[in-house]
Amino acid sequence: MNIEEGTATVVRDALGKRCVEVTFDGRRYTKSGEKPAAPREFVFLFDDSISVNVLSFPTCGRAVLAAQGPAGCPPGSKVGTGRAEFYGGGEAEVAVYNTRFANGMRGVLITVPALGTILDNTLEPVRGTYRRNYTLGLHEIVQPDGVPPQERGATSRFVVTFGATWHGRSFVESHARAGRPLDLGIWSHYVTGQVNLTEGQVARP
């Protein structure tokens, strides 16, 4: 069984006031020390005071990112950074790009350029009881690639920051007053059927 721990931080970006950057820092491991089970999907959950300004930033298409790498994406489309640490050792940089999917939905592409990995994250309103604390989530579904789940690589730590500025706009904003606790979380679903929810609060800067 996977065990998850995580923290989140929120800081003001270069524009200040309502403009922020949100970082999720998640760790996963097993009691036995074995490789964690492969993920099926994740949802990054954002406080109900937070908005994500996908319409104010240029977009990078998945096909462009896959064919040309980050160099092919237009200026202003990069909206986040991060780092992946892998089970068994090694790490790699992570980058986040604003995108529009073929079905018209908006969201981001989280990529590990060194591995050629691209993860689709659709921006969606949360549903059910999650609406008590959250308004939006970035929903990531890990597509099967023919590799058996037990043979897939696994991360022991994944850090991702959502935040950027472009022509006077911030990618992430919060209308909460300074000092108010912000709810942030990560919902996880693994190929074993296990479901986890890691939640916490951080003061609005």
Predicted regions and their residues:
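Ser/Thr/Pro/Gly-rich, low-complexity intrinsically disordered stalk/linker tracts of secreted
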Residues: 1-205
